[in-house]
Amino acid sequence: MNIHEYQAKEILRKYGVPTSTGVVVTKTESINAAIDKLNTKVYVVKAQIHAGGRGKAGGVKVVKSKEEAKKVAHDMFGINLVTHQTGPQGQKVNRLYIESGCDILKEYYFSVVFDRSASCITFIASTEGGVDIEEVAEKTPEKIIKFSVDPATGLQNFHAQGIAYELGFKDHQVKQMKEIVKATYKAFIETDAAQIEINPLIVNKEGNLLALDAKFTFDDNGLFKHPEIMALRDQDEEDPLETRAADAGLSYVKMDGSIGCMVNGAGLAMATMDIIKLYGATPANFLDVGGGADRERVKEALKIILSDKEVKGILVNIFGGIMRCDIIAEGIIAAAKDIGIKVPLVVRLAGTNVEKGKEILSNSGLEIIPAHDLADAASKIVEAI
């Protein structure tokens, strides 16, 4: 789960991380009054959406008067902001965060993430802040600093001190950076976060460190322990199909292609998406129905896939281990009769009760294209659309 920048900063401040402050606007009628609360010479108007690249897309504006700030805020509120992370459809701006500007002497990048490849928490930092860290990693990887934390010992003083020295801080800034490292680590652990990112972390004209932007991503599996974090959820920022799928117990991620996929198992789902690409098409989604799906869940999965108007065909790829192929077949038929599948449908079944499942599909009277293996299935669905 993601939250907005202003919410992330509020959490960081609770843990002692110094951040820039401002006012939140959730409706246009509040804009003027909110800006009047700020006593500053420079105003920063920020669109609050769950996507990066806001600055390049016009979602962050710096102005030098109240009148300009009010005009920019009114113009920005409600627009559809398109960044490299939103996709071409963009994201509607329903919230603004308006801050007092500050003089920046230097920008840094700082984050703490769970590194799955190393199975530990890792700090990532760079002297190149204020830009996409992926761009820095690609062009100047030597400027990326990493410190991994042994889960057996936890964060140690040398981690914090090492990061401060590697970033080139001196004197009181070393102490400030150490405190920021310790505070973000504590926040990461106690909130069950998957990532905390501060970009940029700046040195202001007084020589002090300040988090100018912040991002939190939380581990969905830990949210049941944190009702206060769940309360920060903004469903307007989430894809409605993904929300609907989650409510149905399905793992669904919308993509930009034309072939809908329904698969059991995340690994098989990714392999299915790969082979669709190999045969020259693009998947419209990732959808894992899970190992214990019943007829109703299969039916709901197909309904969700068909709710995407870009879907021109559907590939069902099921390996029946825990799941029975006859149950899948019955769910497909029920969905087809209920909602009327009008796009090509290719079904590949293997495993438990596979012959029974194939027989059910064959006797259904529906236009279902059978496939005997994954390559055959991918070839047939690409040809059919």
Curated annotation (Swiss-Prot):
Keywords: ATP-binding, Ligase, Magnesium, Metal-binding, Nucleotide-binding, Tricarboxylic acid cycle. Its cofactor is Mg(2+). The keyword ATP-binding applies. GO terms for cellular component: cytosol; succinate-CoA ligase complex. Pathway: Carbohydrate metabolism; tricarboxylic acid cycle; succinate from succinyl-CoA (ligase route): step 1/1. Pfam families: ATP-grasp_2 (PF08442), Ligase_CoA (PF00549). Mg(2+) binds at residues 199, 213. InterPro entries: ATP-grasp, ATP-grasp_succ-CoA_synth-type, ATP_grasp_subdomain_1, Succ-CoA_synthase_bsu_CS, SUCC_ACL_C, Succ_CoA_ligase-like_bsu, Succinyl-CoA_synth-like. Substrate binds at residues 264, 321-323. Succinyl-CoA synthetase functions in the citric acid cycle (TCA), coupling the hydrolysis of succinyl-CoA to the synthesis of either ATP or GTP and thus represents the only step of substrate-level phosphorylation in the TCA. The beta subunit provides nucleotide specificity of the enzyme and binds the substrate succinate, while the binding sites for coenzyme A and phosphate are found in the alpha subunit. HAMAP family: Succ_CoA_beta. Belongs to the succinate/malate CoA ligase beta subunit family. This is Succinate--CoA ligase [ADP-forming] subunit beta. The lineage of its organism: Bacteria, Pseudomonadati, Pseudomonadota, Alphaproteobacteria, Rickettsiales. The gene is sucC.
